[in-house]
Each structure stands twice: as structure tokens, then as C-alpha cells.
Amino acid sequence: MMSRPAGDFMEGILAAARQDPVLLDSTPVPALDTPDESGVIDCPIAPKELPDGTMLHGYRVQRTIGSGGFGVTYLAQESLLNRRVVVKESFPDSLCYREEGTLDVCLHDPETGKEGFEWALSNFLREVRLLATLDHPCIAKVYSYFEEHRTAYYVVEFINGISLDKLAAQHARLNQPIPQSSLFGLIVRLLDALDYLHSHKLLHRDIKPDNILITRAGLPVIIDFGAAREAHGDLGTSIVETPGFSPTEQSAPNGNMGPWTDIYAFGATLYYILTGTCLPTCRQRDIYDTAEPLATNPALTALYNPALLATIDRAIMPAPAQRYQSVAEWMQDLAAIRL
């Protein structure tokens, strides 16, 4: 069992963090670029993304906000409750296309593509089931799941905010470093979310700046659980790696992953927003580590308590055993810091 810090201790830190929420403007979440279609189809096809205005199970598509190799993400309006939501569609585009007129998802080759398409749907459903068990203010909530157009969809809470990487870029552009109290509040809130996730025996495995949204109220919210896995399950069968944010064990087929894996990625995220640069990849760091410790960086120690920076340095140690093994360990070190 992974332990959690005592309730009074956690509540005390969270209460202090709430005194100074992370600063941000009201910039809306931008649409992501959509890659071009590839492959030759000898029958009429529609664009990969559903047209704006399409009705899906009581949700009206407003626009596409993301598109990748395994799915499409839409901003939509729920008719019944009159609220904005995010709808994720399973769409492995190397295996399927959208039929013109019906908008149904059809296989390029029904014989060779069926197994891969069913595998993608199975992973999609697994993601829904993982998310549906979670209830934390810093984790996006799942509302519903349905099947339509020969594929599957699930509906997630819409987070009206700005990604952490864009927020950090705004501060850098204005030459306004994130205040220490705001940084501390961000760290504590997200560590609490990770601790909650780990207490449910789940690993996110893809913590990075653009998977954290900051709301207008200053609340950080973790999104995109497509790489999440059960901590006690077989983690080695699926390699998900983001250079500069993923630790060594995540790039190995049988890497020993645990809470320390998400801890590294979160530390790497903090390193990025403080320095404006990504860490070298873990392969590079294993050969020759050029990452300068934050706690000895004069430009940063002039702005932040070196003890706070030292906790981030420990989180991003290349060797898993040298990192914090749990969120509780990191929080204990934070509790001893006087800002």
C-alpha cells in the first residue's frame, strides 16, 4: 500500500497554497494542428474529423481540438444540461477511414485491419474505465461513454484553461517569473493529485506541460490519460515515451515503473517551466548528464528557496532509486521548507 501524508499535514499545505493561486490570463485552449490523411482509398471518404455541428448521442460537435494517430478530440455542447464538454473518439487512422454521407468509421481492409481496430477499441475502453474510477479536483472527470458511427466515444469534463507550457511561455515573454508562492501552490496541488492517482494503483505515465491545464481560478488539472496503466498490471507491454520528460525505466520493455516514474515526469515538467528548456533524454543523461542542478543555478536561487529547488532536483535523478519513491516523501520535504 502507498501511504498518504496525514490529513492535517496535507490540508495545512493545501490551505497555504490556496492563498496565492497560479497567475494566468483568460486565453482559451487553442485548437491543435491536424495531420494530413495518408493512404489511398478507392471509395468516397469524408475528412477524418466529424464536421462542426454533428450531433452525437445528445452532444453537438463545435470544433476539433485535437487529432492524432489513434483518435480525435472535439469540443462539444451537451444539449440536455447545456454545458460544454470534451468528446474523445476512437479513430486509429492507419486502419480506418470515415465514410462519406454516413460518417461511419470503416476499415481500410476488413480482413487485416479487424484485429488492430478491436485492440484500439479495447485500449480506448480501458482508458474510460480507469478515468471513471477517479474523483479529484485536479483530474478531469469522465461523464459518459457511448458507441456510434461504428466506433466508440467518451465524454470528459471541459477544462476552460491554458496549458502549463503556454502559461510558462507567457511569463517568460513578459519577463515575469512565476512567483515562488504560486510555484509552491502548483507543486502541492499536483502532488496531491498524483498521490490520489497512485493510491488508486494507477500511473499516468505521460505527465508533461501540455497535459496540465490551469483554469481561470488558478487550479491545475491533469488531462490525457491515454498512457495510464494500473501500477500492478503489465506495464512493459506498452512503451510510451516523451523525450525530456519520460524516465529511463519507461523506455525499456520491462522497465520497473512505479510512483517514482510519474514523480520524474512531474519534476521534469517543473524543470522545463523554470528553465525554459527540456531535460536531456535519459539515454543522454546515462552517458553524460549535462543537466545543471536547479539548486545551484544562481538565476533561480535568486527567485526561489534553494531547498524547494533541491526537491525538484531529487525528483529528476536519472536512477529511480535516487528519486522520491512516493509523493508522501516529497511532501515531507516540502513541509520542512519555510518560504
Which ranges hold each PLM region?
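AlphaC helix of the eukaryotic protein kinase fold
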Residues: 101-133
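Activation-segment/catalytic-loop signature of the eukaryotic protein kinase fold
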Residues: 145
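Conserved short submotifs of the Hanks-type protein kinase catalytic core
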Residues: 149-163, 167
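AlphaC helix of the protein kinase catalytic domain
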Residues: 164-177
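Activation segment signature within eukaryotic-like protein kinase domains
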Residues: 186-187
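Catalytic-loop of the protein kinase fold
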Residues: 198-214
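Conserved activation segment of eukaryotic-like protein kinases, specifically the C-terminal portion
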Residues: 236-250
